[in-house]
A protein has these predicted regions:
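Core SAM-dependent methyltransferase catalytic element
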Residues: 180-198
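A short, conserved alpha-helix within the catalytic core of class I
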Residues: 113-124
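Short catalytic micro-motifs in class I SAM-dependent methyltransferases
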Residues: 108-112
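Conserved beta-strand signature within the Rossmann-like core of class I S-adenosyl-L-methionine
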Residues: 132-140
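Acceptor-substrate binding/catalytic loop of class I
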Residues: 144-159
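Conserved N-terminal segment of class I S-adenosyl-L-methionine
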Residues: 1-99, 103-105, 122, 128, ...
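Short "lid" loop at the C-terminus of a central beta-strand within the Rossmann-like core
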Residues: 140-145, 179
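Conserved S-adenosyl-L-methionine
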Residues: 169-180
Length: 198
């Protein structure tokens, strides 16, 4: 599995995301159901800023008024074509005013960033959060990390905790989902989840 030319900013990367999420067996089995349930449990009806929204897999199931942001313009267009509100990073950060959100989701974003750059990427979005907003950070465990050539740095719970603290957030909870932590070496879709508050 090769890294698409242009990495995660390329149209090829968007096509790869669409092909992976559109696999017939995944749709028939609704493999995303437990992950949607988990996000709803964590974010409830909060208007959420989905940073690194990709093609909108999570954004499509977030509450009304939620917005996606991604650095890949092709992925943002896929979201818009699906009726979702999404912006490129430059569009969102360059807008007039500062809309406020009650939640922020960064799911499967941080592991794609160059080592040490996660705080710099996420920090500009923190001022868009209301006081006490919920922040959810999600990264793959070992097997999931190895499944994508665009993953650059393995981010575990201590690294997520350090990132949250660097962003000035208060950590509420950290856990493995959907299976216990030891499954992360075998199950591609096991995730590290960190929940924090602004």
């Amino acid at each position: 599995m090769a890294v698409p030319d242009g990495g995660t900013t390329s149209a090829a990367y968007t096509r790869r995301l669409a092909a992976r999420s559109g696999a017939r067996w995944k749709r028939l089995l609704d493999v995303q159901a437990p992950y949607r349930w988990n996000l709803h449990r964590l974010l409830g009806e909060r208007r959420t800023l989905d940073v690194g929204c990709g093609i909108g897999r999570n954004l499509a199931h977030l509450p009304a008024g939620s917005v996606g942001v991604d650095h890949n313009a092709t992925s943002v267009q896929v979201c818009r074509d699906a009726g979702l509100q999404a912006f490129t990073s430059d569009e969102f950060l360059g807008q007039e005013g500062r809309p406020q959100y009650q939640g922020l989701l960064a799911a499967h974003l941080i592991e794609h960033l160059p080592e040490g750059e996660a705080a710099a990427v996420l920090a500009p979005y923190v001022p868009f959060l209301e006081p006490d907003a919920v922040v959810v950070l999600i990264c793959p465990q070992e097997r999931g990390f190895a499944s994508d050539p665009t993953h650059t740095v393995f981010v575990d719970q201590p690294a997520l905790a350090a990132l949250a603290e660097e962003l000035g957030l208060r950590i509420q909870r950290q856990y493995s989902f959907p299976l216990p932590r030891r499954a992360g070496k075998l199950f591609t879709y096991n995730e590290f989840v960190t929940v924090a508050r602004r």
